[in-house]
Amino acid sequence: MAVEQVTYKNIDRGTSNMIMAGLAIAMLASCFDSTIVGTIGFEIAKDLGGMGLYAWMATAYLLCETVMIPVAGKLSDIYGRKILFLIGLAIFTGGSIIAGLSVSMEMFIVCRAIQGFGGGILIPVAMAAVADLFAPSDRGKVQGLFGAVFGIGSGIGPLIGGYIEGAAS
């Protein structure tokens, strides 16, 4: 089976930087969201009366995100990066809004799963977009930037969650 050669779009630097900034912000939000419940989850479970389901807050998100990553990568090859990214962003944002309005632990967990599906679309599509937008000589730098965004998002989630928990109690 031959390897398909990906050709990048030759667009101006300002446009590609703007696109990458948007992708990086969405990826930051997804990574942040996957770790924030580590510190604030106890308070959420207590407020929603669902301590028995506490572990499912993170599990639902991460399980759905993990399942969606390879699926989203393939779907973005078939249907295009932009449309799939927008769908992922809509799913992630909708899940986040409804999670904030949850009145029960079960509802919150379902919303976390929805967020995970959206996040599982955002991450691989953002990474694949690098090949579409940058020459092979620049891809390593941009992938490194995305790796940093992933690390920062995953790292600040628990910090901000801890701050919110401290301020709420």
Segments the model singles out, each with a brief description of its role:
Residues 2-169:
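Transmembrane-helix bundle of Major Facilitator Superfamily
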